[in-house]
Amino acid sequence: MASSKNGTVLFVSLMILLLISTGVKAYCERVRSRSAPHDICKKKNGNAVCKEKCWTIEKYQNGRCLILPKTTKLDCYCYHFDQC
């Protein structure tokens, strides 16, 4: 009987860990802004406008002009956590 409980606890723990790890990854993902103009990052206040668009229109907590490793140009990206 103890072996059955240990197996159940291990299975539930593994499922919780799996759910947390996949949820955090999707929550930290940086997404190209759909509402910000493509040339916004070339302007003096580009980061501020990018953050405002991400916050008010797309409901993300943060937004910033970034060059991601897969891209070669500066674009506005939205994301939830600053530490991602």
Swiss-Prot record:
This is Putative defensin-like protein 38. It is found in: Secreted. The keyword Cell inner membrane does not apply. Residues 1-26 form the signal peptide. One of its GO terms (cellular component) is extracellular region. Disulfide bonds join C28-C84, C41-C65, C50-C76, C54-C78. The lineage of its organism: Eukaryota, Viridiplantae, Streptophyta, Embryophyta, Tracheophyta. Belongs to the DEFL family. GO terms for biological process: defense response to fungus; killing of cells of another organism. It comes from the Eukaryota. Keywords: Antimicrobial, Disulfide bond, Fungicide, Plant defense, Secreted, Signal.
